[in-house]
Regions:
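Short, low-complexity disordered leader/linker segments with a strong preference
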Residues: 1-101
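Short beta->alpha junction loops
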Residues: 144-153, 217, 272
Length: 272
């Protein structure tokens, strides 16, 4: 069957099916939550998170997932990471002591995109709450934030510092050009690189970059959703021409290519 996905994102058929679906598939045994209140939303999130943790834990306890005697980490859908390929001095507890878990975060807190620095503020506040409620397994989480100003060259310098001087357990990065500049090294060092704050379709490469995962929807999938919305809501105006104002970097290019790929398969939507 032909793969109709764009850049590894959600396929067009899947996106249109989701848009047309009237009911969301739910666990019949799941409790109901009041989504009209913030407390209800948080309670539902906590429930879903615990369900996920329980399922993962069961898989690890059964031996289906986790690190085997051959030092290979296995997970769902045939996911594998050969830990024998990691640096000789690597440890899966690097950056973790008896009292602390160190996480490094590069982000923009200055320059034209300084508003994105508020994400780091959110992370810090959340981790303060975690620490105030016993931490993680009794350990406090320390977030070391570096302001790269959305400049990839500065990101490289800070990532080197966080790895070599701070010996962090995990790294968080923001920005497509910034993350692309450092994710090769981060994966070579076998350092967890989760929740990248960018939707570039390069993330989600379990073979070459298994330590890197994205935080948000792929920009390629967003392009399909935009195009689907246009076709469904402007049906009486088709064909339509869509103009895009994008940044002149990897971030903007990902958006541009994603929507152009969608438009090529949908002549009623023209990309400019």
């Amino acid at each position: 069957e032909e793969d109709t996905s764009i850049g590894g994102g959600l396929s067009q058929d899947a996106a249109e099916a989701a848009a047309d679906a009237e009911e969301e598939e739910v666990d019949a045994d799941a409790p109901t939550f009041d989504r009209s209140t913030l407390d209800g939303i948080w309670e539902e999130a906590a429930y879903n998170r615990q369900q996920m943790v329980d399922k993962i834990t069961a898989k690890v306890d059964s031996g289906d997932w986790g690190v085997g005697s051959d030092n290979v980490l296995r997970g769902p859908a045939g996911f594998e990471v050969d830990l024998n390929d990691c640096p000789d001095d690597w440890s899966d507890t690097g950056g973790i002591s008896s009292s602390e878990i160190k996480i490094g975060h590069t982000t923009a807190q200055s320059g034209n995109l300084a508003a994105y620095g508020n994400i780091a503020v959110g992370w810090d506040n959340y981790l303060q709450w975690i620490n105030g409620n016993g931490g993680i397994d009794g350990k406090n989480v320390t977030l070391i934030v570096k302001d790269d100003g959305y400049v990839a060259a500065q990101t490289i310098e800070f990532i080197d510092e966080l790895i070599e001087a701070e010996n962090v357990f995990a790294l968080l990065t923001l920005g497509s050009p910034n993350s692309l500049a450092v994710y090769d090294k981060i994966n070579e060092e076998c350092i967890p690189h989760p929740f990248i704050m960018t939707g570039h379709p390069a993330w989600g490469d379990p073979e070459i970059h298994p330590w890197t995962t994205g935080l948000q929807m792929s920009y390629s999938t967003e392009a399909i959703l935009w195009g689907t919305w246009i076709k469904q809501n402007l049906a009486d105006m088709l064909p339509v021409t869509v103009a895009g104002l994008v940044m002149d970097n990897d971030f903007g290019l990902a958006y541009e290519l994603g929507f152009e790929a969608y438009a090529e398969g949908n002549p009623d939507v023209v990309s400019e």
